[in-house]
Amino acid sequence: MSKSTIRIATRQSPLAMWQALYVKEQLQIAHPSLVVELVPMVTKGDIILDTPLAKVGGKGLFVKELELALLSSRADIAVHSMKDVPIDFPEGLGLVTICEREDPRDAFVSNHYDSLEQLPAGSVVGTSSLRRQCQLKALRPDLIIRDLRGNVGTRLSKLDNGDYDAIILAVAGLKRLKLTERIRSSLSAEQSLPAVGQGAVGIECRLDDHDTQALLAALNHADTATCVKAERAMNTRLEGGCQVPIGSYAIWQNGKIWLRALVGSPDGETILRGERLVSPEDAEQAGISLAEELLDKGAREILTAVYQGNTAI
């Protein structure tokens, strides 16, 4: 292999750095002589912390600066949390590797209550996600949902300071940061369907950089990739972004792919759901047909209202 060094573009948050260091470690296990360097940077999503994500607008809030580093050859690969990766890529770039998925569920985190069911009426729950908000409001319309921004540590500090009675975070992020003890319970997919790609780490690079792609091949987890691609196919057909009330989750079940999806109004009053059970080779097409089913049920109207800023969070 002619390439001796790989530079990884990454956000500077603790969780993003964990992901980049994980990819570095896996690359060096697969290729012991390879030199791997990190190129930390700050994204728009890291800077704008006083506005709910759904109102910031635009796609790629957490990836654009990393992609510019790839296009200018300041980095060879960019490591992303798959739930933050937009459906479209700049010309010349693409998603080439999806690593094995961690637990994709949402975590219920509280200092006083063990579960969502235990929260008294009127409790304040923090989340920056319209996907989580719509499902929480559908389950518990008596709760008050308030915006919660910042990295994992910042969000936990706000909980500890008494700003919230509970917050919802990703199980995967808490596990990776060795904060599992903060998880009071994990929400089932029936309670809170995960985001597209949640729990998976993806690697983006220049499509003409075949040497780098060859090095990355060892990190691709085929079973995870099949599931995430089905979820993303659904999201692509819906023309969904990362900050919209869309959930999609695929798992392997007896050799087939079970794909579930939802689109919800932010107030939780309307939740459109659908599912498919298909052979792996049909997984992406199933994502498309599932999206079309949701569109037929009224998903377009819900998403249009969200894009126009009619959100409650």
Curated annotation (Swiss-Prot):
Pathway: Porphyrin-containing compound metabolism; protoporphyrin-IX biosynthesis; coproporphyrinogen-III from 5-aminolevulinate: step 2/4
Superkingdom as given in the UniProt entry: Bacteria
One GO biological process term: protoporphyrinogen IX biosynthetic process
Modified residues annotated as S-(dipyrrolylmethanemethyl)cysteine in this record: C242
InterPro entries with a match to the protein in the record: HemC, Porphobilin_deaminase_cofac_BS, Porphobilin_deaminase_N, Porphobilinogen_deaminase_C, Porphobilinogen_deaminase_C_sf
Broad class of enzyme this protein falls into: transferase
PROSITE patterns linked to this entry: PORPHOBILINOGEN_DEAM
EC number: 2.5.1.61
Gene Ontology cellular component list: cytoplasm
Pfam families named in the record: Porphobil_deam, Porphobil_deamC
Cofactor note: Binds 1 dipyrromethane group covalently.
HAMAP family listed in its UniProt record: Porphobil_deam
Family: Belongs to the HMBS family.
Assembly, per entry: Monomer.
Protein name: Porphobilinogen deaminase
Species of the source: Proteus mirabilis (strain HI4320)
Gene: hemC
